[in-house]
């Protein structure tokens, strides 16, 4: 983020990038680096050209389906209705320790975590995979013959199972924390599973770290992520993902009023 390429380094990268033998992930690395180099030099046209080429090359290497993401968003809205939360109100693990920071990448979640964890009662951890792992298990279970798909199968869980899921989360995350009363889980994609979170951890705090769509989406477009976040490699896909995100967060506000705190980055 802070490294500035020298003119000589830029020339070398340009030479390598023009070599027809360079392809695939190496081509991605070079073009994102050149995009950063020319952005630092305020040559924004050339910077965008390299970012765009790097992103399109990366997009061809990954298997991302924006229509499937929209479908999953609609399924969450349809399945996680008011009746689900009334049926299982306060039935999971009662711990109030977890603070979930959700949203999109590049929306300020790290800064928010740093601010919160500066308090003596709050501990920062990392982007914990536990909720995504659990939702994946439920999704695989739903694909078996005769089972309802996730998230519709949440309606078929019982109190014992919900509590066990909450207990498992608290136990499995112990390795990432000490005895501090509250800890932060800042996996941004957890916003897709707030319904599941509130069923198994009804007293958990949830914060939506939100940033202006132009700033958030373009920042994601310029970022080559170490893994995941495949929606960021196309401006069209980023826009659709942001729209799905806002639509789903609006739904959580309707069915779980007062349970999600919105923090706007620009404020």
Stretches found by the model and what they are:
Residues 1-177:
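Alpha-helical solenoid repeat scaffolds of the TPR/TPR-like class and their adjacent stem/linker regions
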Residues 125, 130-158, 176-267:
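PAPS-dependent sulfotransferase catalytic domain
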